């Protein structure tokens, strides 16, 4: 019976596909005949053929028909009809652009219509609204902008286009910061895929790495500032919503493959189609790189190193990949995405920061030293209008396998063993060569969401909308393993007790409401969200997240004043790590360890004032944003554990402008930021930390010929300084303090004073401070179109500029030199 049912379903699907293919072939034949009529000057005949069959056209055929109908109307000097069909075309495809072969009148008409329209996004208020009405500063990155940037991953796209976002390198996985707030990994910015959270519930991490395909994206919507009033925890500094293409956008199959220096191999496959009311989009992407071997000048200290070679940009032994599917049928939508990423740290752990021999260390389930994540995300939603209220319900499921396997040292660390005196096996391990830390956990979470949207109109000058929603999520860590590797291949025994301590589950409840009301040119947008979280130890977190924005709209400009507060709870992994370390390093009971090692949520308050101008000069848009941020309870990695010791106050100015012409585009941004208050290692440094005071980007695109398109990206960063706790000085301070204590206990006063003086000197040097020079990087690229075949070439860091970056809990990390890639793509 089951086989018979499957056979019937398969037969029906096959028939539908054959019917769709038959209709497509018929419609394509009609269009080609009309196009032939147009080319020989029989414009009225071409117009009649298309008008008679337009209702039956779908996908790219319909778009081509609307374009040709507009051209026919122009040929007959019917500007009104030409404009009508051009608007219909842009309704079908808002990102359509005229080609060099199109008449100038048609190109000008399309650009004029597009200029009169403001792009819409859904991220800022969970409903479609124009950029002018968005309550917080927002950056919209289109598919064309992604191509023009030449970016290889999401990190590079965001750094190129989003003011205030910049790359940090914590010698960890791929990372990015917003307005100077960052961590070891990317856990302060909420990253979503079509509104579905990608950040881990265990670590809060969503790395903007090669595990997220760029080819599948239609646009990227970025909210610059706190957004917990809608999205709760993790949306501390910004929200990035990745919007995929739809099947109709692609209408076929696209394949792309590339190869470059340092062992780079990249491939992408996309499939998209719309069958009646069913829209289907499927994507797959993979990337591999052996990395660039370099010998940078690193700092010397008392700890040795086995090699001078550092490998930068290595993607482990297994390629990063991203596979997924999205299907829409009327109000029903399903999405599934799985991605894998594996990034190798160039240097050893923390501020030891030494080169190491990567291939000498053992593997765990095939995983070599790296930061490795494999995730699965599924989302099923249904949208329906009921009594003028638009309702949307969603079911979500997420599953991740997380591995942090980091080399500590290739030489004995007697100073490190002091911290584990209560665990002789681990203390002994640090007296051996080739030590590393291996942490692995498997998490899963599921949730249910319900959102509603009611729109009302009192009269032409009074209208608005009321949004509301509630959500429940459950997270659990099913497995946790913690090992110390020594002698490169040996490991300490796994502790069943520690593994059990690592396991746990947490529950999340939240509700929100948002009111948007417009009185003529004035819009008030106010929202509030309440989050209630039950932690693994039954403690509670209760957070209120308000937002209030005033927007004044004019045809050519707008003003925005907004306040918002956000929070992010301390990651489960950090809290459990503190507990495990406290249990290992002392003999206190677990309950006491939990209370002593508890971490509080981080929070941020932000006040922003924005002025934006639209089309003051044809094709030119600009924005100036002034912000004040105050962040408290920021979590700082303190060698091997975590503390709420960070506080940050900063002011800044963000400038954006874009100029779009038929054959030329330019996107520019500049950020100036000054930190008023900043604390590192319990000391006020009151300066930007790993954040340039001035950073700027210019991305240019030029349609040189019908087939050739060129693009350039210039990125400038002013001098910056890194401040971190120095583990070398921490070891020295601990060693001298212990020797002083021993001398004091034996009554050796003079010796005691000498050791205390050395301990004080080490303590004074506890904050590691180094400058990084200003840099200007240049990236170039080109695309050559031959029919449906596209040839591409991109080169990054054209002048092979040598530079270093840093981040949290590390020293200076060398960056990539000149990398290039050739690619070829074909659209079937």
Which residues does each PLM region occupy?
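Gram-negative outer-membrane beta-barrel transporters
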Residues: 518-524, 617-632, 643-729, 825-827
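Extracytoplasmic beta-strand/coil segments of soluble accessory domains associated
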Residues: 123, 138, 155-196
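Short strand-turn segments of transmembrane beta-barrel domains in outer membranes
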Residues: 239, 244-273, 284, 596, ...
């Amino acid at each position: 019976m089951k086989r018979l049912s499957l056979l019937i379903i398969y037969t029906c699907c096959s028939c539908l596909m054959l019917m769709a293919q038959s209709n497509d072939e018929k419609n394509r034949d009609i269009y080609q005949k009309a196009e032939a009529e147009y080319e020989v000057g029989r414009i009225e005949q071409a117009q009649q053929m298309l008008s008679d069959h337009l209702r039956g056209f779908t996908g790219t055929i319909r778009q081509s028909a609307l374009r040709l109908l507009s051209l026919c109307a122009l040929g007959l000097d019917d500007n009104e009809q030409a404009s009508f069909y051009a608007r219909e075309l842009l309704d079908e495809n808002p990102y359509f652009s005229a080609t060099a072969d199109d008449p100038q009148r048609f190109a000008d008409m399309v650009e004029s219509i597009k200029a009169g329209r403001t792009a819409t996004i859904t991220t800022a208020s969970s409903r479609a609204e124009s950029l002018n009405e968005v309550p917080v500063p927002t950056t919209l990155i289109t598919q064309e902008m992604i191509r023009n940037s030449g970016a290889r991953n999401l990190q590079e796209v965001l750094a190129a286009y989003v003011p205030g976002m910049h790359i940090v390198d914590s010698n960890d996985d791929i990372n990015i910061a917003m307005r100077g707030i960052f961590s070891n990994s990317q856990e302060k910015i909420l990253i979503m895929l079509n509104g579905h959270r990608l950040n881990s519930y265990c670590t809060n991490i969503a790395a903007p790495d090669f595990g997220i395909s760029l080819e599948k994206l239609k646009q990227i919507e970025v909210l610059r500032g706190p957004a917990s009033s809608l999205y709760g925890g993790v949306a501390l500094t910004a929200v990035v919503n990745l919007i995929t293409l739809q099947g109709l956008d692609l209408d076929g199959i696209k394949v792309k493959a590339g190869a470059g220096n340092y062992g780079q191999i990249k491939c992408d496959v996309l499939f998209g189609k719309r069958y009646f009311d069913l829209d289907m989009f499927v994507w797959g992407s993979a990337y591999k790189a052996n990395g660039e071997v370099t010998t940078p000048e690193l700092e010397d200290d008392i700890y040795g190193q086995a090699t001078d070679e550092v490998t930068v940009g290595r993607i482990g032994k297994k390629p990063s990949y991203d596979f997924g599917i999205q299907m829409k049928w009327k109000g029903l939508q399903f999405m599934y995405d799985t991605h894998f990423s594996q990034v190798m740290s160039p240097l050893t752990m923390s501020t030891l920061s030494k080169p190491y021999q990567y291939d000498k260390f053992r593997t765990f389930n095939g995983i070599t030293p790296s930061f490795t994540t494999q995730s699965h995300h599924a989302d099923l939603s249904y949208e329906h209008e009921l009594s003028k209220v638009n309702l949307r319900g969603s079911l979500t499921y997420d599953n991740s396998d997380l591995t942090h396997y980091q080399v500590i040292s290739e030489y004995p660390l007697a100073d490190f063993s002091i911290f584990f005196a209560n665990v002789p096996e681990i203390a002994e391990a640090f007296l051996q060569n080739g030590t590393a830390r291996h942490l692995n956990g498997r998490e899963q979470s599921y949730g249910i969401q319900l959102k509603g949207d009611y729109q009302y109109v009192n009269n032409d000058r009074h209208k608005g909308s009321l949004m509301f929603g509630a959500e429940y999520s459950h997270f659990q860590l099913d497995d946790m393993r913690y090992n110390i590797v020594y002698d490169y291949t040996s490991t300490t025994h796994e502790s069943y007790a520690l593994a059990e301590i690592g396991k746990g589950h947490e529950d999340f409840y939240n509700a929100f409401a948002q009111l948007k009301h417009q009185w003529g040119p004035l819009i008030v947008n106010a929202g509030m969200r309440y989050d209630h979280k039950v932690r693994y130890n039954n403690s509670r977190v209760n957070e209120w997240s308000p937002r209030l924005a005033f927007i004044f709209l004019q045809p050519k400009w707008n003003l925005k004043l907004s306040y918002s507060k956000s929070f992010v709870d301390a990651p489960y992994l950090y809290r459990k790590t503190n507990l495990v370390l406290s249990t290992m390093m002392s003999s206190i009971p677990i309950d006491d360890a939990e209370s002593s090692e508890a971490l509080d949520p981080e929070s941020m308050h932000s006040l922003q004032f924005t002025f934006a101008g639209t089309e003051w000069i044809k094709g030119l848009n600009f924005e100036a944003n002034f912000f004040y941020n105050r962040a408290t309870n920021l979590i700082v990695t303190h060698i091997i554990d975590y503390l709420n010791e960070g506080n940050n106050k900063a002011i800044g100015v963000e400038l954006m402008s874009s100029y779009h012409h038929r054959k030329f585009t330019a996107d520019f941004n500049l950020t100036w930021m000054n930190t008023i208050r900043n604390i590192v290692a319990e000391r006020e440094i009151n300066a930007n930390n790993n954040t340039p005071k001035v950073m700027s980007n210019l991305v240019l695109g030029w349609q040189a010929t019908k087939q050739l398109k060129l693009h350039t990206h210039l990125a400038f960063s002013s001098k910056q300084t890194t401040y971190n706790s120095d583990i070398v000085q921490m070891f020295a301070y601990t060693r001298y303090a212990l020797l002083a204590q021993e001398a004091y206990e034996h009554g050796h006063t003079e010796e005691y004073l000498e050791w205390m003086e050395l301990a004080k000197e080490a303590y004074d040097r506890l904050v590691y401070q180094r400058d990084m020079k200003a840099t200007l990087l240049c990236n170039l690229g080109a695309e050559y179109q031959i029919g449906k075949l596209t040839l591409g070439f991109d080169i990054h860091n054209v002048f092979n500029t040598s530079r270093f970056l840093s981040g949290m809990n590390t020293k200076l990390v060398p960056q990539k030199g000149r990398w290039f890639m050739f690619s070829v793509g074909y659209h079937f």
